[in-house]
């Protein structure tokens, strides 16, 4: 299995700063948010940070699995939906949080459930970006984001390869 050539490694510190920046942007909208729905699993960490920063106590999850081999996305399956009370009024006043929108397939499924919710991700790729209301950083579609919860400390090859000099 070969992963994409373009890598975007994100440290815990950087992710925390970016998630706080996401909360800052949402706070600037001056709306009355009453709940957050985290898209699991990637949305759990940014949702915790956004909840803290915005003072939101009601946190829900929606669990959607995409079975894949880290090079291609498979079929989407809803493992756990959103509670009925948060689905009322199309999700108005609810922030849906995820770490990343890639193809937009996951966001499309949740947006179908909650068309009036506000969708926020820390990172966005071009294909998924139209489905997201607020994000912090856009990366190219062919970039692989390495999140801190997926990494350990290992040696990294130089970008230029094995050029001596």
UniProtKB/Swiss-Prot annotation:
Xanthine binds at residues 102, 145. The keyword Cell inner membrane applies. The gene is gpt. Its EC number is 2.4.2.-, 2.4.2.22. It comes from Brucella anthropi (strain ATCC 49188 / DSM 6882 / CCUG 24695 / JCM 21032 / LMG 3331 / NBRC 15819 / NCTC 12168 / Alc 37) (Ochrobactrum anthropi). It is found in: Cell inner membrane. 5-phospho-alpha-D-ribose 1-diphosphate binds at residues 41-42, 98-106. One of its GO terms (cellular component) is plasma membrane. GMP binds at residues 102-106, 144-145. Belongs to the purine/pyrimidine phosphoribosyltransferase family. XGPT subfamily. SUPFAM superfamilies: PRTase-like. Coiled coil: none annotated. Homotetramer. Keywords: Cell inner membrane, Cell membrane, Glycosyltransferase, Magnesium, Membrane, Metal-binding, Purine salvage, Transferase. Its cofactor is Mg(2+). It is a peripheral membrane protein. Pathway: Purine metabolism; GMP biosynthesis via salvage pathway; GMP from guanine: step 1/1; Purine metabolism; XMP biosynthesis via salvage pathway; XMP from xanthine: step 1/1. This is Xanthine-guanine phosphoribosyltransferase. It catalyses: GMP + diphosphate = guanine + 5-phospho-alpha-D-ribose 1-diphosphate; XMP + diphosphate = xanthine + 5-phospho-alpha-D-ribose 1-diphosphate; IMP + diphosphate = hypoxanthine + 5-phospho-alpha-D-ribose 1-diphosphate. Purine salvage pathway enzyme that catalyzes the transfer of the ribosyl-5-phosphate group from 5-phospho-alpha-D-ribose 1-diphosphate (PRPP) to the N9 position of the 6-oxopurines guanine and xanthine to form the corresponding ribonucleotides GMP (guanosine 5'-monophosphate) and XMP (xanthosine 5'-monophosphate), with the release of PPi. To a lesser extent, also acts on hypoxanthine. Mg(2+) binds at residue 99. Guanine binds at residues 102, 145. NCBIfam families: PRK09177.1 (NF006613). GO terms for molecular function: guanine phosphoribosyltransferase activity; hypoxanthine phosphoribosyltransferase activity; magnesium ion binding; xanthine phosphoribosyltransferase activity.
């Amino acid at each position: 299995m070969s992963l994409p050539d373009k890598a975007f490694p994100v440290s815990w510190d950087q992710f925390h700063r970016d998630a706080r920046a996401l909360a800052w942007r949402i706070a600037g909208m001056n709306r009355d948010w009453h709940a957050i729905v985290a898209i699991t699993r990637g949305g759990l960490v940014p949702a915790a940070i956004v909840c803290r920063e915005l003072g939101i106590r009601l946190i829900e999850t929606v669990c959607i699995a995409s079975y894949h081999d880290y090079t291609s996305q498979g079929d989407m399956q809803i493992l756990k939906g959103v509670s009925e009370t948060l689905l009322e009024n199309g999700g108005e006043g609810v922030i849906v949080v995820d770490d990343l929108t890639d193809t937009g397939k996951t966001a499309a499924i949740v947006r179908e459930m909650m068309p009036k919710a506000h969708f926020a991700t820390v990172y966005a790729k071009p294909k998924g970006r139209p489905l997201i209301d607020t994000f912090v950083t856009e990366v190219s579609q062919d970039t692989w984001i390495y999140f801190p919860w997926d990494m350990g400390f290992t040696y990294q090859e130089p970008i230029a390869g094995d050029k001596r000099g």
